[in-house]
Amino acid sequence: MFAFFDEDLTVLDFSLFKNVVSIEIGDKSFTYVKTVCIAELPKLESVRIGFHSFFHADEYDGTQTADCHFYAYDCPELKELIIGSDSFVYYSRFVVKNLPSLEEIMIGDSVYCSQCFTYASLELKGEGMEHEVKNRLSKAENTQDWCGLFQEVRTSAD
């Protein structure tokens, strides 16, 4: 069963919900959304997205949906960003910026062959992000999983 299977809903912008503390999206949700924006939420602490969400109808025939983007930025209290397997498969951009409290990003499932953000570049922006990413990847048990996750990994302090 798909939730929010509405062709007219193409942008999901949470920035108006300034008092939200947690965002939880279930499995198989938001089929036609092409842009997800989680931005400027001063109280947000947790984002959890289920498996097979943001999976476009175009993807069923194996074609890439153009210009699909995920943004999470300027949420000073965000501690965790967890995305289930096979979500955002054909998204072309994944940007995480200025999340000073971020402790955990979990994308996909280590047991199941995940296909999250298969066609995206990973952009981590903000003070200290480059250092943190390099340190955490060097300590990862299986860096091969990370290497295949994104087409390109970029970090910067801007």
PLM region descriptions:
Residues 1-5, 29, 53, 62-63, ...:
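Small-residue (G/S/T/A) turn/hinge positions that recur once per unit in extracellular repeat modules
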Residues 9, 20, 33, 44, ...:
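Conserved hydrophobic position(s) of the canonical leucine-rich repeat
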Residues 45-49, 77-83, 101-109:
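Right-handed parallel beta-helix
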Residues 49-69, 109-122:
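Acidic/polar low-complexity surface segments
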Residues 94-96, 102-158:
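Leucine-rich solenoid repeat scaffolds
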